[in-house]
């Protein structure tokens, strides 16, 4: 069945609007201050039976089927009432987007979708309005259920650790190792100081293999500290305890064991999915238009700042500190620190993403006022740990949402006034 047909079926369940004339209608169910008509039930029953015949599927007895259909219509009515109660409104733009998405999912144009709907006996305007109601009901349910969900940081951390372990189980690491041993009577703080000095040299670019040949007393010293490829479960415990999904090139340590201090290098990684983001360090000057200072005046003032900076008459830092109307960054000479561009408003984000390092922008306007910005630096930052926690949060949210949505609907049903006016099986 095409996607739109499944939506059409839901629509028929909810509104029972068909082109064929209906005999004298009557109220079948009262739901709070709303009603479900007998024609709604009859149409839904006939639609289900027709779909079952086309697909070769069997259905329960008419009485059981009717009971299920009525219950579905009651729940739909209650959710629609909740949407009205909290004031959810779906405008035409949002509705048009949803209709276009339904058409795309069925490889149709909107016009073709409308023709298909009408061919099934439902007027297209009624179809549109029912989709509007369904979106509103869905948004109301989402908003009301979210309020019931509480996710503790400890839950996120625990699941993130579990996910990391599962991911790490298949990851292979090529490990380099330097061991500095304790000797009898030696001050252990001296060994620690030596290890820290080696780590500094390694972080400054010293060759790990050469350092291992020179200083290591470990079992792989004669191989330049190379332990080859290993999964965590194959490593010595003191290694495995330190490996936490670090990237290729990471220097780990120094860390202590009973025999001395150790330094590891992750020479390479296989099978690890990492998440890296670009952070930008920028500084800016903000001038806010007022009843006295027009947009043109603010822009002119910033252009004068750019001229003075380029002429060497003043520095960006001096002007930001003296004139910027962003008090937080003005106190830091205009610097915003390393941030991901997504944190900024769109116009500012575009500037910090596209400006070369060391360049100053032309004056531009955002909701905050007029700016000039200079990009000081860019860097790649590993956000694998944050991504894992975000994934854990989404999993927990989805689990709890499904649980709470079921509980919410049961409570909604239990607290509603529902009266079956006519329980005769007309089918």
Curated annotation (Swiss-Prot):
GO terms for molecular function: peptide binding; peptidyl-prolyl cis-trans isomerase activity; unfolded protein binding. The keyword Transmembrane does not apply. Its EC number is 5.2.1.8. Residues 1-19 form the signal peptide. It is found in: Periplasm. GO terms for biological process: Gram-negative-bacterium-type cell outer membrane assembly; protein folding; protein stabilization. SUPFAM superfamilies: FKBP-like, Triger factor/SurA peptide-binding domain-like. Keywords: Chaperone, Isomerase, Periplasm, Repeat, Rotamase, Signal. The keyword Protease does not apply. Residues 170-268, 277-377 form the PpiC domain. One of its GO terms (cellular component) is outer membrane-bounded periplasmic space. Pfam families: Rotamase_3, SurA_N. It comes from the Bacteria. The PPIase activity resides only in the second parvulin domain. The N-terminal region and the C-terminal tail are necessary and sufficient for the chaperone activity of SurA. The PPIase activity is dispensable for SurA to function as a chaperone. The N-terminal region and the C-terminal tail are also required for porin recognition. NCBIfam families: PRK10770.1. PANTHER family: CHAPERONE SURA (PTHR47637:SF1). Chaperone involved in the correct folding and assembly of outer membrane proteins. Recognizes specific patterns of aromatic residues and the orientation of their side chains, which are found more frequently in integral outer membrane proteins. May act in both early periplasmic and late outer membrane-associated steps of protein maturation. This is Chaperone SurA. The lineage of its organism: Bacteria, Pseudomonadati, Pseudomonadota, Gammaproteobacteria, Vibrionales. The gene is surA.
């Amino acid at each position: 069945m095409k996607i739109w047909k499944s939506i059409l079926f839901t629509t028929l369940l909810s509104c029972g609007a068909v082109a064929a004339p209906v005999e004298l209608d009557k109220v079948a169910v009262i739901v709070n201050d709303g009603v479900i008509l007998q024609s709604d039930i009859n149409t839904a029953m006939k639609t289900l039976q027709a779909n079952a015949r086309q697909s070769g599927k069997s259905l329960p007895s008419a009485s059981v089927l009717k009971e299920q259909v009525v219950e579905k219509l009651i729940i739909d009515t209650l959710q629609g009432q909740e949407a009205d109660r909290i004031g959810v409104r779906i405008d035409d733009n949002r509705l048009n987007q949803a209709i276009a998405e339904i058409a795309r999912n069925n490889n149709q144009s909107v016009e073709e979708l409308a023709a298909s709907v009408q061919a099934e006996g439902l007027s297209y305007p009624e179809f549109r309005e029912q989709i509007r109601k369904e979106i509103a009901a869905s948004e109301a349910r989402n908003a009301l259920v979210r309020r019931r969900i509480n996710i503790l940081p400890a839950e996120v951390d625990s699941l993130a650790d579990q996910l990391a372990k599962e991911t790490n189980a298949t990851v292979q690491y090529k490990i380099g190792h330097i061991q500095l041993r304790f000797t009898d009577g030696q001050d252990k703080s001296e060994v620690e100081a030596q290890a820290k000095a080696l780590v500094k040299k390694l972080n400054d670019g010293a060759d790990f293999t050469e350092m291992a040949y020179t200083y290591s007393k470990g079992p792989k010293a004669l191989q330049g500290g190379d332990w080859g490829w290993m999964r965590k479960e194959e490593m010595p415990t003191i290694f495995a305890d330190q490996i936490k999904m670090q990237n290729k090139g990471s220097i780990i340590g120094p860390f202590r064991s009973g025999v001395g201090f150790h330094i590891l290098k992750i020479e390479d990684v296989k099978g690890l999915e990492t998440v890296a983001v670009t952070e930008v360090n920028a500084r800016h000057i903000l001038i806010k238009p007022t009843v006295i200072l027009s947009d043109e005046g603010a822009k002119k003032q910033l252009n004068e700042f750019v001229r003075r900076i380029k002429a060497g008459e003043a520095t960006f830092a001096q002007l930001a500190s003296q004139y910027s109307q962003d008090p937080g960054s003005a106190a830091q000479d205009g610097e915003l620190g390393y941030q991901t561009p997504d944190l900024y408003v769109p116009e500012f984000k575009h500037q910090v993403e596209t400006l070369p390092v060391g360049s100053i922008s032309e004056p531009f306007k955002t909701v905050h006022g007029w700016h000039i910005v200079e990009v000081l630096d860019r860097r790649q930052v590993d956000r694998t740990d944050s991504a894992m926690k975000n994934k854990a949060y989404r999993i927990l949210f989805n689990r709890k949402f499904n649980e709470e949505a079921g509980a919410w609907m049961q409570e909604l049903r239990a607290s509603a006034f529902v009266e079956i006016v006519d329980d005769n099986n007309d089918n």
